[in-house]
Amino acid sequence: MRALGLDLGTKTLGVAISLSGIWANPYKTIFYDGTSYEPLIKELKTIITQNNIDTLVLGLPKNMDNSLGFAAERSLKFKNALEENFNLEVVLID
């Protein structure tokens, strides 16, 4: 498994790569304006192609009571954008 770990913030996307499926190493931070995912998708296309990625792992930050707040809703919207642009499995993890 070659996976990208994604941590979506309000202005940045943290990216880590796992080439073994066991360990992940920091790769880069991508900056965006917080309103459009297009710059992120464009950059991710390059990273995915260059590293033969087959799985995307996206952080889903839940509240302490396991409910979904604003940050989780933002992650779910980004998950939809990833699924629309890539034919890859997108796994959510808290």
Region locations from a protein language model:
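Phosphate- and other anionic-substrate recognition elements at nucleic-acid/protein interfaces
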Residues: 2-3, 11-94
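Conserved catalytic-loop position in the HRD/HxD motif
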Residues: 7
